[in-house]
Amino acid sequence: MANLGFPELVLIAVVILVLFGWKKLPDAARSVGRSMRIFKSEVSEMKNDGAEAEKTSAASTKTDEITSVSSTDTPQPTVTVESKDEKKHPA
């Protein structure tokens, strides 16, 4: 596909002209240009979102590590619940 010469390019141009015609060709080229611009902006937006997600995940990973270390160091409170029978008949 990389070896397109002048005759091949002329043939492609003729086929495009036959398919779209002289009148519709500028509109078709304009719509292709708009589509390419939208596609490029979406790709760059996805790259930016991916970079932000990496920064956020790296920060949350550090926070998770700190949280997990600190949660094992502190004693957990214990709660005891008395039943109704124990309240009526103390031992």
UniProtKB/Swiss-Prot annotation:
GO terms for molecular function: protein transmembrane transporter activity. The keyword Hydrolase does not apply. GO terms for cellular component: TAT protein transport complex. InterPro entries: TatA/B/E, TatA/E. Gene3D superfamilies: 1.20.5.3310. Pfam families: TatA_B_E. One of its GO terms (biological process) is protein transport by the Tat complex. Residues 43-55, 82-91 have a biased composition (Basic and acidic residues). Coiled coil: none annotated. The Tat system comprises two distinct complexes: a TatABC complex, containing multiple copies of TatA, TatB and TatC subunits, and a separate TatA complex, containing only TatA subunits. Substrates initially bind to the TatABC complex, which probably triggers association of the separate TatA complex to form the active translocon. PANTHER family: SEC-INDEPENDENT PROTEIN TRANSLOCASE PROTEIN TATA (PTHR42982:SF8). Belongs to the TatA/E family. This is Sec-independent protein translocase protein TatA.
